Amino acid sequence: MILLAVLFLCFISSYSASVKGHTTGLSLNNDRLYKLTYSTEVLLDRGKGKLQDSVGYRISSNVDVALLWRNPDGDDDQLIQITMKDVNVENVNQQRGEKSIFKGKSPSKIMGKENLEALQRPTLLHLIHGKVKEFYSYQNEAVAIENIKRGLASLFQTQLSSGTTNEVDISGNCKVTYQAHQDKVIKIKALDSCKIARSGFTTPNQVLGVSSKATSVTTYKIEDSFVIAVLAEETHNFGLNFLQTIKGKIVSKQKLELKTTEAGPRLMSGKQAAAIIKAVDSKYTAIPIVGQVFQSHCKGCPSLSELWRSTRKYLQPDNLSKAEAVRNFLAFIQHLRTAKKEEILQILKMENKEVLPQLVDAVTSAQTSDSLEAILDFLDFKSDSSIILQERFLYACGFASHPNEELLRALISKFKGSIGSSDIRETVMIITGTLVRKLCQNEGCKLKAVVEAKKLILGGLEKAEKKEDTRMYLLALKNALLPEGIPSLLKYAEAGEGPISHLATTALQRYDLPFITDEVKKTLNRIYHQNRKVHEKTVRTAAAAIILNNNPSYMDVKNILLSIGELPQEMNKYMLAIVQDILRFEMPASKIVRRVLKEMVAHNYDRFSRSGSSSAYTGYIERSPRSASTYSLDILYSGSGILRRSNLNIFQYIGKAGLHGSQVVIEAQGLEALIAATPDEGEENLDSYAGMSAILFDVQLRPVTFFNGYSDLMSKMLSASGDPISVVKGLILLIDHSQELQLQSGLKANIEVQGGLAIDISGAMEFSLWYRESKTRVKNRVTVVITTDITVDSSFVKAGLETSTETEAGLEFISTVQFSQYPFLVCMQMDKDEAPFRQFEKKYERLSTGRGYVSQKRKESVLAGCEFPLHQENSEMCKVVFAPQPDSTSSGWF
């Protein structure tokens, strides 16, 4: 019985796990010439998979394969010769007809005589146990041509038994899995495992990033230990995470078929493959089977200065709200990435002051060593005469998609040196914090420059003596989000003066859930409940928000709810609005809040019926099963009806990944004297102040001040024009993905996705004693352009797919307060402007000689504007504030 079981297992394993035959790989018969046909084709489209919507090309040929030598000591050690003949290049889509770029052109005209000759020269492949030992070709052949031959040769590497292993072929060192059957072998290559040197980068934030998926399956039909047919298919799909309409697909196929065999060259005798190769042709040299990098040369392309002359008109200040400005900004960045320092410096020095800020945006966004050296040489940080340019450079550094240690080192050097403007010095440190976080997210926390920057931030905060320095380092820490900085933030949050305490608390607000430990919550509870000292309302409410948003305990929630009713009137209303917003929006804390509210002591009419005008509301801008865009607006007033803080946030979520798109906070304090009102508890001695702070795409910017001090306030009230103050304005490279792919056919593919925007965020605070009314305005104007460019290049023919998606949008928040009576009237409005939405598509096939086929499409629509809903109480209040005035029918004195 045991013997039968053993025999059965042996039979099953040999039948299912290997192809019939005695070798571990392909084996050629002696003195035979195998004549095959070969073709490789590539298709590009937007993922629809329809041939008529695709662009691409096919390279085909006859192939002769012969065994030159077999090791007398082992059958599985072979040297084979592979020769391509009768090469042809044609369209995959035969519907091109007269539009075909290949029509009437011979292969030598398409490829060039030298390239064609090189492609048809034989290559040698040394196989041991079916795996490539060495690949031999001639020196000084074009890399692109050698890659095509590598792609064909790699098909002959296989094994005839099931299993998983690592192989080196044209794709690199890859993990492959073989599934062997009686007369068939399926080879699955894990393309994401392939180790091959290729340039590329991507945006680390998942929301703004690009997702890709690649597959490779090769099917071998085997007869007598040799292939009678091979079919390989490789696909690359990619898509922009937050906008799924932006996607693309590359399909590469190879097909090899045996047509016949005939008498071939006699087997050469010898014990070493090297001696045989030398005897065949001494000009053969061993080269890597792994695909090599090549660059297609641009013939007659304009210089950087010529390109800039045609681009600069689109980047004039008056044109920045147009999509063509962003489109040209993105295109120019691509040219800057191949430019030398001297070329870049030349155009910087020649430009005028109106266009220079936009040029600085582009040069900094290029993120190359040459562009960084050029901009650092150009900007003089010791002078305060070019503050706008210095600030634009620093913010472009903060928004950098793939910053490196070199950039961080440059900022540290500038900070340690002489800086003419205190505002610029502060901005350098704030952006240093941003770069630390981005490099740490990309596993660069142990880089020397990052370690130095951490010490600079934490050490500077510890030793800071001036209030301005403390604020600077806290803002840097708010961007860096260093776990080791939390104790310092807690210290300043609990013991610091009002503005410093508030800044430290809002910095803690940006940390992820795992960092808001029980110890952190203990300190925040002490701040909220004022166990050790009296705190301003802004600090207390920020502390409560952190507790409620980070897995609060039952007692945390209960104590906060019990405090409602005992707080100053407007803070009471604000905290009540926060709790109601948690319940209405089904935030994570909503379940535990509902549990606590079941207790009568926490949930009673007296506690939840207090009047006031402060509010908090969260809503959806857009929602789908995989993503969501949310907005939140909360406003806290003083007891006298004057704004203390308004906070407008926009978030984008994809799955569990999030992006803090924007935050605009307007703060005011110490304005009660203007209307002879009594300040709230703990705020009796505050200086008059109003200012604005912004976070943009996860980067905290340097706050701006409307006025500081009573005399400054009065002078600005008397001379006020109502014009908004800009917080940030410029061109930003937001999405930046570049990927170079080595297709197993030997062709080279590139995927480029770029997203840029022209942005202008401004704010204003208007105050009228005559009408006893104040208005707060925040305007967001954004023009967004996202471009994709997919190409497959063989050096003599290129196919490409370019798309562009663009829109121009506006979002305005207005808060109107009438404090001529109490309770005062408050109306909040949040409006989104009507926005055009345009999509462009361009597909092309182009020969290196210049002849091309182009197909273009355009689609336009309009996204309707809307007013975002806030709570019902606000709607009722707005009807009163903006009640229609009765028509006057009197025409005389009486």
UniProtKB/Swiss-Prot annotation:
SMART domains: LPD_N. It is found in: Endoplasmic reticulum; Golgi apparatus. Pfam families: MTP_lip_bd (PF19444), Vitellogenin_N (PF01347). Residues 28-659 form the Vitellogenin domain. Changing G746E: In ABL; no loss on localization to the endoplasmic reticulum; does not reduce interaction with P4HB/PDI; inhibits phospholipid or triglyceride transfer activity; inhibits apolipoprotein B secretion. It catalyses: a 1,2-diacyl-sn-glycero-3-phosphocholine(in) = a 1,2-diacyl-sn-glycero-3-phosphocholine(out); a 1,2-diacyl-sn-glycero-3-phosphoethanolamine(in) = a 1,2-diacyl-sn-glycero-3-phosphoethanolamine(out); a cholesterol ester(in) = a cholesterol ester(out); a triacyl-sn-glycerol(in) = a triacyl-sn-glycerol(out). GO terms for biological process: cholesterol homeostasis; chylomicron assembly; circadian rhythm; establishment of localization in cell; lipid metabolic process; lipoprotein metabolic process; lipoprotein transport; low-density lipoprotein particle remodeling. Changing L435E: No loss on localization to the endoplasmic reticulum. Inhibits triglyceride transfer activity. Disulfide bonds join C174-C194. InterPro entries: Lipid_transp_b-sht_shell, Lipovitellin_superhlx_dom, MTP_lip-bd, MTTP, Vitellinogen_b-sht_N, Vitellogenin_N. Keywords: Disease variant, Disulfide bond, Endoplasmic reticulum, Golgi apparatus, Lipid transport, Lipid-binding, Signal, Transport. SUPFAM superfamilies: Lipovitellin-phosvitin complex, beta-sheet shell regions, Lipovitellin-phosvitin complex, superhelical domain. Liver and small intestine. Also found in ovary, testis and kidney. Changing R540K: Does not inhibit triglyceride transfer activity and apolipoprotein B secretion. Changing Y528K: Inhibits triglyceride transfer activity. The keyword Glycosyltransferase does not apply. Changing C878S: Inhibits triglyceride transfer activity. Changing N780Y: In ABL; no loss on localization to the endoplasmic reticulum; does not reduce interaction with P4HB/PDI; inhibits phospholipid or triglyceride transfer activity; inhibits apolipoprotein B secretion. Its main location: endoplasmic reticulum. Catalyzes the transport of triglyceride, cholesteryl ester, and phospholipid between phospholipid surfaces. Required for the assembly and secretion of plasma lipoproteins that contain apolipoprotein B. May be involved in regulating cholesteryl ester biosynthesis in cells that produce lipoproteins. It is linked to Abetalipoproteinemia: An autosomal recessive disorder of lipoprotein metabolism. Affected individuals produce virtually no circulating apolipoprotein B-containing lipoproteins (chylomicrons, VLDL, LDL, lipoprotein(A)). Malabsorption of the antioxidant vitamin E occurs, leading to spinocerebellar and retinal degeneration. This is Microsomal triglyceride transfer protein large subunit. The gene is MTTP.
